Regions:
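Active-site and donor-binding regions of nucleotide-sugar-utilizing enzymes
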Residues: 8-171
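Conserved catalytic-core segment of nucleotide-activated headgroup transferases in glycan assembly
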Residues: 15-25, 29, 148, 158, ...
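Catalytic donor nucleotide-activated moiety binding site of glycosyltransferases and closely related
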Residues: 35-51, 216-257
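Donor nucleotide-activated moiety binding/catalytic core segment of transferases
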Residues: 57-71, 232-279
């Protein structure tokens, strides 16, 4: 089967975000010779991308299966667990989603993700080894990802992350979060973006912020808007949802909706509290 190198399909899980989104936006603007299609698992994401004026398909739709058979490049930002049969023979461009400072993928030896990771490498190892190009951002990260993911050096691409290097303005949601929360234009924006814990993705937020009332008092006194941006594996945690329900109307707290790409407003962020990456 001959694949068309001028058709690129993209996916970043269950949202329009991440490095695939930023490369998607860049190619649409600067490479009109390439057809770009955003692939979706759910109708709400497909409809959202279509409302932006872009082409989008569901993986399990007739149109989606057709475009998967034709496309030459599949852009992702993770080592996917599932590759649809229609993707056989496609080139995978893995942009990854954050620099590495912990054990990932093949080097994971415990935690709640270990079994899923082991299964996907048993199932997909041939694809990872033979069809996947992998983006790395430095010599240090080359060594890290070669060890952690079993990537051969000749399959590495050395470049910056699209979400950090693409300078085209992108606006897929209202950016004036100060006004949305009723704060003044000179309010400072601070983002708190922790990653999940390997051995406990649940009951994290109250341990991290034991006195929310005191925190909100300080934020109000300092005229700070604190954006709580949880990892997708944490945002559905019962404890986090309880805190969100109790404090979401506080003008100095914004519980971030991961459907919105926080990188669109990064130029307006004054400080970030992070412990890994902002994916």
């Amino acid at each position: 089967m001959t694949r068309n190198k001028h058709i690129w399909i993209f996916n970043a899980g269950n949202s329009y975000s991440g490095n695939p989104k930023w490369l998607f936006e860049y190619i649409r603007r600067h490479h009109p010779d390439i057809r770009t299609v955003w692939m979706c698992y759910h109708k709400d994401v497909r409809n959202y991308v279509k409302r932006l004026g872009y082409e989008a398909c569901l993986f399990d739709s007739t149109a989606g299966k057709t475009i998967m058979k034709e496309a030459g490049v599949y852009v992702v930002e993770m080592c996917k667990e599932v590759f649809q049969p229609e993707l056989e023979g496609i080139t995978i461009l893995n942009l990854w989603h954050g620099v590495g400072c912990k054990s990932i993928e093949r080097k994971v030896t415990g935690g709640f993700l270990q079994e899923r990771i082991a299964k996907k490498y048993i199932r997909n190892n041939r694809i990872y080894k033979n069809a996947q190009l992998f983006l790395v951002t430095s010599e240090l990260m080359e060594k890290h990802f070669m060890e952690q993911c079993g990537i051969d050096e000749e399959l590495l691409i050395r470049a910056g992350y699209p979400r950090c290097t693409v300078t085209d303005p992108v606006c897929t949601y209202p950016h004036d979060i100060r006004a949305i929360k009723g704060l003044s234009d000179d309010a400072r924006i601070v983002v708190y973006a922790p990653t999940y814990r390997d051995y406990a993705k649940e009951n994290f937020i109250k341990a991290a912020i034991p006195d929310m009332d005191r925190l909100t008092q300080v934020l109000q006194g300092e005229n700070i808007l604190l954006v709580l941006k949880m990892h997708p594996l944490v945002e559905k945690d019962t404890e986090y949802l309880q805190v969100k329900a109790q404090y979401e109307h506080c003008p100095n707290l914004l519980f971030w909706d991961n459907a919105n790409d926080i990188y669109e407003i990064f130029e307006d962020v004054d400080a970030a509290i992070i412990d890994y990456s902002l994916s």
